[in-house]
Design a protein with these regions (language model features):
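SAM/dcSAM-binding transferase cores
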Residues: 2-37, 210-213, 227, 233-274
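The AdoMet/dcAdoMet-binding core of the Class I SAM-like
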Residues: 2-8, 28, 54-216, 237-238
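Short, isolated positions in well-ordered beta-strands
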Residues: 33, 52-53
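Short strand-connecting beta-turns/loops that link adjacent beta-strands
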Residues: 40-41
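A general beta-strand register signal
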Residues: 46-47
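Structured N-terminal alpha/beta-domain signature
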Residues: 154-157, 169, 183, 231, ...
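Conserved short secondary-structure elements within globular domains
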Residues: 216-230
């Protein structure tokens, strides 16, 4: 009997029985990527032994990440995605007919190649959409530059915020404002809500942005309202949290594109003790 041990949470180990290892690679960026089939749960992606996505419930995460921010801007045309190597974030963005250009910055091209060649069920055709443009640059260097054209929406789909990644997040958030037009919006994955932790990752990011709003006079982005929300994703064994920055505070989710996210998502933050 084959067993895969999952060490996503510190001090906790999950043992998945009767698994099938479909792929195990080390990317040129040094990340170990494992694609595993788990009975009843389907195929899951692990990076450095931490769960990243599972085909049975990835839509819960990706729809929650994308549809609120897409609904916050009237007729969004230009969208920037930071991360999102499975292609599912792009899949949800490209459902909007007003979108003309999606620039996706995923620095690990080996992850993209793996999902393009073997696991198309995540992207569901997004890779072939001519509106999607892929870049494998280091976003933390690219972000220091000034863009040729600003975006209506920026979606940050990166690693969990933590003390170890604090400086990287601070650097990214310091420079991202010049990539977004003044009426645009930004959303970011803000980590898993940990009931056993006294310091939540979404609080760290929110505090970082609120500090920036007070010291960066030219940073219009962080003058906007920060709206937190969350969704429970079974594969993550916890609640994924998100932060939305938008000057538009009066909008509803666009249901014409088949989103399963309801407007009740905004009430989810009320249990945060924000």
């Amino acid at each position: 009997m084959s067993i895969y041990t999952d060490h996503t949470w510190e001090g906790v180990t999950y043992a998945w029985q009767n698994v099938t290892m479909l792929d195990s690679i080390v990317t040129y960026r040094g990340t170990r990527v494992e694609m595993i089939h788990r009975p009843k749960w389907g195929i899951a992606c692990y990076m450095d032994n931490a769960i990243q996505s599972c085909e049975i419930d990835e839509a819960l995460y990706h729809e929650s990440l994308v549809h609120p921010v897409m609904s916050s801007v009237s007729c969004p045309k230009r969208v920037m995605i930071i991360g999102g190597g499975e292609g599912a974030t792009a899949r949800e963005v490209l459902k909007y007919p007003t979108v003309e250009c999606v620039d996706m910055y995923e620095w690990d091209k080996d992850v993209v190649k793996l999902f393009q060649s073997k696991y198309p069920q995540w992207a569901k055709g997004a890779w072939d959409d001519p509106r999607l443009h892929l870049y494998h640059d280091d976003i933390f260097k690219t972000i220091e530059e000034y863009p040729v054209d600003q975006y209506d929406i920026v979606i940050i789909d990166l690693f969990d915020p933590s003390n170890a990644t604090y400086d990287s997040w601070k650097h990214l958030l310091k420079h991202i404002n010049k990539w977004v037009r003044s009426e645009g919006s930004v959303v970011m994955y803000a980590g898993i809500r940990e009931r056993t932790s006294s310091e939540q990752s979404y609080e760290m990011l929110a505090n970082m942005m609120m500090t920036m709003s007070g010291v960066m006079d030219d940073n219009i982005l962080y003058k906007n309202r920060i709206t937190p929300y969350r969704v429970f994703v079974p594969s993550f064994s916890g609640e994924s949290t998100f932060l939305l920055l938008s000057s538009n505070t009066d909008f509803k989710i666009d249901h014409t594109i088949g989103s399963h996210v309801t407007d009740l998502v905004w009430k989810s933050y009320q249990t945060f003790n924000w």
